[in-house]
Amino acid sequence: MTRPLFITFEGPEGAGKTSVLEALVSELKPILGDQLVTTREPGGNPISEAIRQILQPEDDNGMDDRTEALLYAAARRQHIVETILPALSAGKVLISDRYVDSSLAYQGGGRDLGVDNIWQINQFAIDGLLPDLTIYFDVPSELGLSRVMANRQGKIDRLDKESLSFHQRVRTTYLELQHDFSDRIKIIDATQPLTDVISDTRALLQEALNSRKG
């Protein structure tokens, strides 16, 4: 008998987590079949995807920082209800590209709204639901942003365009979260070649999948 497994991928801009996820899903899908569900935040269902379009335009839309934080939490709540909980209730493996730690890092740290404040907002949204495993891909802000500018080919949103100091605060907050919740959040050195990052991530996923059995 197997139990459900909730895994999240986190990281600052340019860490390469989405590329790693795509590579490993192509390996896992033939093994797990419909027992594997992949999703993203903000998004994962029509309502949350609509909120994503508001949150991530190419240019600054004048959104207030607290409005931004509340919209991310709202998108997350719908994502949980419509996508995450049904998958976990069915005993599946769900991997999400971002979850609540993104709000803590980006709005709590980057926007300087305070991690505790953002946590309180999101407590109402997640109702205690935390991942079994969070894989955090760490990269210095300067390197991450240079990757974004080189690789996204015009797909630059307003968060990408934030100041270097904003992105440095995001990374600092992620590292603090990883330190404080090291049992859940595992760190990957994302400055390595992509093949090495994939290999390190594969090992963490395999360990989590093995623990699911029993």
Curated annotation (Swiss-Prot):
GO terms for cellular component: cytosol. Keywords: ATP-binding, Kinase, Nucleotide biosynthesis, Nucleotide-binding, Transferase. This is Thymidylate kinase. PANTHER family: THYMIDYLATE KINASE, UMP-CMP KINASE 2, MITOCHONDRIAL. The keyword NADP does not apply. It holds the Pfam family Thymidylate_kin. It comes from the Bacteria. Phosphorylation of dTMP to form dTDP in both de novo and salvage pathways of dTTP synthesis. One of its GO terms (molecular function) is ATP binding. It catalyses: dTMP + ATP = dTDP + ADP. GO terms for biological process: dTDP biosynthetic process; dTTP biosynthetic process; dUDP biosynthetic process. InterPro entries: P-loop_NTPase, Thymidylate_kin-like_dom, Thymidylate_kin_CS, Thymidylate_kinase. It is an enzyme of class 2 (transferase). Belongs to the thymidylate kinase family. NCBIfam families: DTMP_kinase (TIGR00041). The keyword Kinase applies. Its EC number is 2.7.4.9.
